[in-house]
UniProtKB/Swiss-Prot annotation:
Its cofactor is Mn(2+). This is Guanosine-3',5'-bis(diphosphate) 3'-pyrophosphohydrolase MESH1. It catalyses: guanosine 3',5'-bis(diphosphate) + H2O = GDP + diphosphate + H(+). Its EC number is 3.1.7.2. Mn(2+) binds at residues 35, 61-62, 122. The lineage of its organism: Eukaryota, Metazoa, Chordata, Craniata, Vertebrata. Keywords: Acetylation, Hydrolase, Manganese, Metal-binding. It is an enzyme of class 3 (hydrolase). Changing residue 24 to A: Abrogates ppGpp hydrolase activity. It comes from the Eukaryota. The gene is HDDC3. It holds the Pfam family HD_4. InterPro entries: HD/PDEase_dom, HD_domain, MESH1.
C-alpha cells in the first residue's frame, strides 16, 4: 500500500470521511475527527509508538462503532491486522450501555498489546477532554462516574506503557482515584 506515511494518511482520510458529520459533545462542537487524530498523536508523541498497525487502528478505532463502516471494509482497505485491532476496541452497540461498559472492564486485561495501547490513549484523550470542559448535558457527578469507570478499565491495562499509565494515574489522582 506504499510507505508508512501514505498508509497513515490513508487511515486519517478514511476516518475523516466516515466521521465528517459528527461532532464531539464539548460546548464548541469540535469535529469528531480531532479525537482519533488526538489518540494517534498521544501514541506517537507521548508513548513513543511507531507501529503503523497500532497507529492506523488508533485513527480508525471509532469508525465501526460510530459510523456505517464494517470490519470487512476496514480489512479491505487496511488489512487483517488493523481489522483485528479495530475489532478488539469496538463496543457492540447492540448491547445496553451498562453492559458495554462492564465488558470493557472485564475484557481489558485479555486484550492484545496493540489494543491495550489504543485503549490507554483513548481513555487519556477522553479524560483530558473531560478535565478541559464538561460535555453538553453532563453533570459533574456523571464526569466523576466516567473517571471511576475509566480507572477500572485502565487497571486492567497496566503493564502496557509506562508513559501513558503515569499520565493516567496523575489524572485519576486529581479526582481522588487510584489504580
Amino acid at each position: 500500500m506504499g510507505s508508512e506515511a501514505a498508509q497513515l494518511l490513508e487511515a486519517a482520510d478514511f476516518a475523516a470521511r466516515k466521521h465528517r458529520q459528527q461532532r464531539r459533545k464539548d460546548p464548541e462542537g469540535t469535529p469528531y475527527i480531532n479525537h482519533p487524530i488526538g489518540v494517534a498523536r498521544i501514541l506517537t508523541h507521548e508513548a513513543g509508538i511507531t507501529d503503523i498497525v497500532v497507529l492506523q487502528a488508533a485513527l480508525l478505532h471509532d469508525t465501526v462503532e460510530d459510523t456505517d463502516t464494517t470490519l470487512d471494509e476496514v480489512e479491505l482497505h487496511f488489512g487483517a491486522q488493523v481489522r483485528r485491532l479495530v475489532e478488539e476496541v469496538t463496543d457492540d452497540k447492540t448491547l445496553p450501555k451498562l453492559e458495554r461498559k462492564r465488558l470493557q472492564v472485564e475484557q481489558a486485561p485479555h486484550s492484545s498489546p496493540g489494543a491495550k495501547l489504543v485503549k490507554l490513549a483513548d481513555k487519556l484523550y477522553n479524560l483530558r477532554d473531560l478535565n478541559r470542559c464538561t460535555p453538553e448535558g453532563w453533570s459533574e457527578h456523571r464526569v466523576q462516574e466516567y473517571f471511576e469507570w475509566a480507572a477500572q478499565v485502565v487497571k486492567g491495562l497496566q503493564g502496557t506503557n509506562r508513559q501513558l499509565e503515569e499520565a493516567l494515574k496523575h489524572l485519576f489522582k486529581q479526582r481522588g482515584l487510584t489504580i
